[in-house]
């Protein structure tokens, strides 16, 4: 019994920010109203229109002609309503690419049921659901509109959303793509920096789908598996940072510390050779080059849980440490997230920018807006796909290389799946 309890405790620590039990004062609900209201409205709209069917509805887009090229936008997703939280957590805990737990098939339902009420409260605080599907749809619409102009030979283009843990699931999106009779399919990760636990998991889902149904794809697959230094992505981040710096008092602006915050990883994953830390660092370096190193900065990591070593320093500890050293003007920049979700809207905006900032005596703390509906970001996505099509490459050179100490045999099968495609 003691062993089982220890295993459950380890499982509870394994899911990052989604499993945390923050005590948040209700008196600090609104800190950045210009952002809160827009996100709350988006989430409310999602709540009203969410479908509660067993499977996902086809992703409806206006099409005059049969689509020729499909772009599958891959991400983990987020629950649209409070009622979706349990199933979201259940799928997350069952994902062996993300975490490996003892007796996972039994532990996952237990943990999901136990944690649902607390996670529902976090989503209630950000408007009742995640806006990530809204933003992904908006980005996809802008992307395919530009692509039809940039690449008429591969048009019409259609975007599909493939989430790992909520509808529309990756597998459901693939089924729709197959029904649409596409000539070409591009698996486009929405994580700029590659990690085996994020992009790797989504690509593994594509391989597993075809392996389980026992048939080959009718369309030609390729993948955009990372894009940490794309010039328009860097420009978007730089623009949003400059915009937010303008909100600091003029006399304090030059001393604002820019904290680039990314989701942390356990050092056990990093030490296997996961490229995520290096790719996040590359993004930060390019952004600061674009900004001509206008302010002091650091790369910090959020969402660590449990006693095991993770990438550091942690975002919350960094805020505390800076304040103790008299640096009390801070700009948080979510550098590994392109759309708002629980880790920006709750962890950064509430836990850190409201509660922690009050405790530490921060003078001014702000968070750079996520890329969300920025038209330049849709242009970046279109440019990435257009360049990928023109390159005639199946994937990046990096994807062909397994982590030196990889322990997941499915990764090798997935790499073989994509590198064996014929364009």
From Swiss-Prot:
It is a peripheral membrane protein. CDD domains: Ferrochelatase_C (cd00419), Ferrochelatase_N (cd03411). Protoporphyrin IX binds at residues 115, 123, 130. Binds 1 [2Fe-2S] cluster. GO terms for cellular component: mitochondrial inner membrane; mitochondrion. Residues 1-54 form a transit peptide. Gene3D superfamilies: 3.40.50.1400. Its cofactor is [2Fe-2S] cluster. It is found in: Mitochondrion inner membrane. It comes from the Eukaryota. Transmembrane segments: none annotated. SUPFAM superfamilies: Chelatase (SSF53800). [2Fe-2S] cluster binds at residues 196, 403, 406, 411. Pathway: Porphyrin-containing compound metabolism; protoheme biosynthesis; protoheme from protoporphyrin-IX: step 1/1. It catalyses: heme b + 2 H(+) = protoporphyrin IX + Fe(2+). PANTHER family: FERROCHELATASE, FERROCHELATASE, MITOCHONDRIAL. HAMAP family: Ferrochelatase. Homodimer. Homotetramer. Interaction with PGRMC1; the interaction results in decreased FECH activity. Interacts with ABCB10 and SLC25A37; this interaction forms an oligomeric complex. Forms a complex with ABCB7 and ABCB10, where a dimeric FECH bridges ABCB7 and ABCB10 homodimers; this complex may be required for cellular iron homeostasis, mitochondrial function and heme biosynthesis. Interacts with ABCB7 and ABCB10. Belongs to the ferrochelatase family. This is Ferrochelatase, mitochondrial. It comes from Pan troglodytes.
